[in-house]
Amino acid sequence: MDSVIQEAKRVIIKVGSSLVTNDGKGLDANAIQKWAAQIAQLRALGKEVVLVSSGAIVEGMQRLGFDKRPVGIHELQACAAVGQMGLAQIYETSFRQHDVRTAQILLTHADLADRERYLNARSTLFTLLRLGVVPIINENDTVVTDEIKFGDNDTLGALVANLIEADALIILTDQRGLFSADPRKDPNAVFIHEAKAGDLKLEAMAGGAGSSLGRGGMLTKILAAKRAAFSGAHTVIAWGREDNVLTRLAGGEAIGTQLTAQTAQLTARKQWMADHLQTAGAVVLDNGAVQKLTAEGKSLLPIGVTDVSGSFGRGDVITCIDQGGRAVARGISNYASSDARRIMRKPSADIAAILGFVEEPELIHRDNLVLL
């Protein structure tokens, strides 16, 4: 098995907190200098690199004198604000030794959910890469309330991969990769060298009840690989303390677990819809509508909707849910939630009589719908 990183031209590298900090006591300058040296070598090979790095909160705790991770959200946000200064400084210093310029970009999921801000972020990143800069991205923990949690930057890395249509996502962690079970508890645990991104068996393995892999954050990494595959990006999950792991991957060596993207690449517009972590509302579909969407590639008609939840407007992205509660698609609604409730279960020919107007015969047109 050859590494998919060797042929990749544009790579997202996600480095977790445990790899850039001294056991939770501030940033590890030596480790960060090693990352910078390896990334500089990747750039010398002609690769464009974007780095997604955690570590701001831990650095802020050190600077503000916290012995333990604060419980209060505002204390965490204060740590993130203070620590982000140190994170940016040490990366800039480390990359400068290799004559590489860096840029700091702080994002929230809301930035990528808004179409205009999404396109602006995309254009800025493309410009930075064209200018030879290594963008260093982190979640803007200072202003968010529900994204300060373990593993969230795995998702952010996948979103950035989709945003700029990267060829590969490297998730560096404190574990060797994926196992079929917890190797510390199960002597029969098998290391997974390669699998398909989006394989439901992997999700079940990592997220089952009592799964140590799930508690260790492996489920977020598996889901991140699935998300990155929307844009055709392959994912490698590897132990970050492996000597020269990045340069060896770039040289073709197979390290860690490789999750290959085997789904058709989405258009930029459909990538944006798929990357909505939170949607304005949802519609529940009957079995016939699910079949039409998933197997036949049809539009969603009002007659196939059995329930509407949330408050959304025309043009908002909503989730389509099957009778079992599973999200099967996302799409742009042609009708506000109040109107959708009135026309659900009704044939499209009745829309004008019910509402007094017709926007479209479909609730969601197939061109504005993406399967999950």
Swiss-Prot record:
GO terms for cellular component: cytosol. It comes from the Bacteria. Pfam families: AA_kinase, PUA. Pathway: Amino-acid biosynthesis; L-proline biosynthesis; L-glutamate 5-semialdehyde from L-glutamate: step 1/2. ATP binds at residues 14, 173-174. Its EC number is 2.7.2.11. One of its GO terms (biological process) is L-proline biosynthetic process. Keywords: Amino-acid biosynthesis, ATP-binding, Cytoplasm, Kinase, Nucleotide-binding, Proline biosynthesis, Transferase. Belongs to the glutamate 5-kinase family. Catalyzes the transfer of a phosphate group to glutamate to form L-glutamate 5-phosphate. HAMAP family: ProB. This is Glutamate 5-kinase. It comes from Janthinobacterium sp. (strain Marseille) (Minibacterium massiliensis). The gene is proB.
